[in-house]
């Protein structure tokens, strides 16, 4: 039987469930597929099939994560659910499944718990732009405790607002009751998905963003000049476009005089394509792997940033010992690696394998950096951590 082709008729969104352990993230994921399967918009995935997660690797880190897909009448969703707290931290920091928005699951009986807070903070640091809240286990609240739910909601709204998530919709329901088919609770799942449809905007497509291509290789073609190759990360580049070469050395401007793909000339290259760009007046020694070619003034090179980082445990192939301020590993961004010096925040003496921490990095060479960008940390040829740039300092 021939493989089904992916029909792109609806906008595609990546989301995930986040929240404290045992508040019902996986049950909710199953309940969503059940409610939508009744309308022919999903295949029902039961709890055990989601909970039995495959291992995947992102930036050298093993993550357990389940990917489920479903549709609403308006959109196609890819939904990631992770079993353990550490897997969420790793998944969000490495960007294994970049989220356009998240469903924060909170048990109405417990309210916000430590991991609820940690996931909200992480979501902010790694750039998850929107959150919709599902207040779960509402069936376990008695009439006389109904007022407590209002307090839980108020506390949640304050928590979210503190971290920059204003006016997040909060839907009350019971994932378990919906999964069991209780009609009034299935309706709540539909209400939740409507809130997700309405409050998590479709992200801008990569081709609509300013052009950027990390340089992977440089060739010299006699009589024609210098060609740089790489995969276009975003935007579109056309013959005749003015571009900048950013990173490692002083920024330079040039003009793209040719775009090639598989040795064929093209009028333009766009996001996702592997291309060669012919650059006017640039010598082979003027450019190198690790620089980026981009739309003028869309990206600058920097040497100092704050990063949100997950440090691998010894069992994951990471370090065996802690590190301190002054630690100098290699930081990998796109196609380049640069040595950086770590400064730990005040009050943090050391970082242990398995920790999730935010610290400052001073790079020894300038690199084209942006907030929200992912990086890996390596030492002696192995990955010891991964992170996201939470703030550019200089």
Curated annotation (Swiss-Prot):
Top-tier EC class: hydrolase
Amino acids binding GTP: 19-26, 81-85, 136-139
G5: annotated span: 174-176
GO cellular component: cytosol
UniProt superkingdom: Bacteria
Annotated segments matching region G3: 81-84
EC number(s) given by UniProt: 3.6.5.3
Sequence segments annotated as region (G2): 60-64
Region (G4): 136-139
PROSITE patterns: G_TR_1, G_TR_2
One Pfam family, short name: GTP_EFTU
Domain tr-type G: 10-204
Reactions the enzyme catalyzes: GTP + H2O = GDP + phosphate + H(+)
UniProt region (G1), positions on chain: 19-26
Coarse class of the protein's main subcellular location: cytoplasm
Family as reported in the entry's similarity comment: Belongs to the TRAFAC class translation factor GTPase superfamily. Classic translation factor GTPase family. EF-Tu/EF-1A subfamily.
Designated name of the protein: Elongation factor Tu
Organism in which the protein naturally occurs: Chlamydia abortus (strain DSM 27085 / S26/3) (Chlamydophila abortus)
């Amino acid at each position: 039987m021939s493989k089904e082709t992916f029909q792109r008729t609806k906008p595609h969104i990546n989301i995930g469930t986040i929240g404290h352990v045992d508040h019902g993230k996986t049950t909710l994921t199953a309940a969503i597929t059940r409610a939508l399967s009744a309308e022919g918009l999903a295949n029902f995935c039961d709890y055990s099939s989601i909970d039995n997660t495959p291992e995947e690797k992102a930036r050298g880190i093993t993550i357990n994560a389940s990917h489920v897909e479903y549709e609403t009448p308006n959109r196609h969703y890819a939904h990631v659910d992770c079993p353990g707290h550490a897997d969420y931290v790793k998944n969000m920091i490495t960007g294994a499944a970049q989220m356009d928005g998240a469903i924060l699951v909170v048990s109405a009986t417990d309210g916000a718990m430590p991991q609820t807070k940690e996931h909200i903070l992480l979501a902010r640091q790694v750039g998850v732009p929107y959150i919709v809240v599902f207040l779960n286990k509402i069936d376990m609240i008695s009439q006389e405790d109904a007022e407590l739910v209002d307090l839980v909601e108020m506390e949640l709204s304050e928590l979210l607002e503190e971290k920059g998530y204003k006016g997040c919709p909060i839907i009350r329901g019971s994932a378990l009751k919906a999964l069991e088919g209780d009609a009034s609770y299935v309706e709540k799942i539909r209400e939740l998905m409507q809130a997700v449809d309405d409050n998590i905007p479709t992200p801008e497509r990569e081709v609509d963003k300013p052009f950027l291509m990390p340089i992977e290789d440089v060739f010299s073609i006699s009589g024609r000049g210098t060609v740089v190759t790489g995969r276009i990360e975003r935007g579109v580049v056309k013959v005749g476009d003015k571009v900048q070469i950013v990173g490692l050395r002083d920024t330079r401007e040039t003009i793209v005089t040719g775009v090639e793909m598989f040795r064929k000339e093209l009028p333009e290259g766009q996001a996702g394509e592997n291309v060669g760009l012919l650059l006017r007046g640039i010598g082979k020694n003027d450019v190198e792997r690790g620089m980026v070619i981009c739309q003028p003034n869309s990206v600058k090179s920097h040497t100092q940033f704050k990063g949100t980082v997950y440090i691998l445990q010894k069992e994951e192939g990471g370090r065996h010992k802690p590190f301190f301020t002054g630690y100098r590993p290699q930081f990998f961004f796109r196609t380049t690696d640069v040595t950086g010096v770590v400064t730990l925040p005040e009050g943090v003496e050391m970082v242990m394998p398995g920790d999730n921490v935010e610290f400052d990095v001073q790079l020894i060479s300038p690199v084209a950096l942006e907030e929200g960008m992912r990086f890996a940390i390596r030492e002696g040829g192995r990955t010891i951590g991964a992170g996201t740039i939470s703030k550019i300092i200089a």
